[in-house]
Amino acid sequence: MAANEYHFLTPWFIPGATVEQVWALVSDATSFPTWWRSVFLEVSVEQEPEDGSGVGKRLRYHTKGYLPYHLYWTGTVAAIEPPTMIEIAASGDFNGVGRWTLSQRENGVYVALDWRITVDQWFVKKFAFIMNPLFAWNHRWAMACGEEGLIVHFGRLKLKGAGA
């Protein structure tokens, strides 16, 4: 594997949620800036598929991590099996494939995020051989923010439901 190639497998657990609830958010990337705001700064739809399947939907992303750099990339839905799997082909500042897999557990939802990417920003390519541990830490930070964002989101929903 080249120094600028990465494989990240991240597990999340969202307690008290159903697969359908989590799917509603993770399959709608335009919602990411509301619950994953520290990482997803902007998401816009570039193309909707004509057949309504979701395959071929193209979105433009502006993201960042804890480190002081931003990533601009396009994600195209390559495969989708509602409500348990969505696969995104990424291109731009990084290229590769990301797959979200959801499974219902007794007390919540397990989410596996599997990213296989090549980062093409000049400084990542130039300094990857010494910076890879820091880039991996940055990815873990971003993923932890996403898990926390979903947990907080569903916690708020429960509070609203309890008060109604």
Which residue stretches match the model-derived regions?
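Glycine-rich portal/gate segments that line the openings of hydrophobic small-molecule binding cavities
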Residues: 34, 44-97, 110, 145-164
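Hydrophobic beta-strand positions in extracellular immunoglobulin-like domains
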Residues: 14, 63, 115-117
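Short amphipathic alpha-helical/adjacent loop interface patches that line ligand
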Residues: 26-29, 143, 147
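Beta-strand/loop substructures that line and gate deep hydrophobic ligand-binding cavities in soluble
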Residues: 89-145, 161-162
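Hydrophobic ligand-binding cavity/cleft-lining segments
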Residues: 1-51, 164
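Catalytic cores of transferase enzymes with a strong primary signal for eukaryotic protein kinases
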Residues: 32, 43-47, 59, 119-123, ...
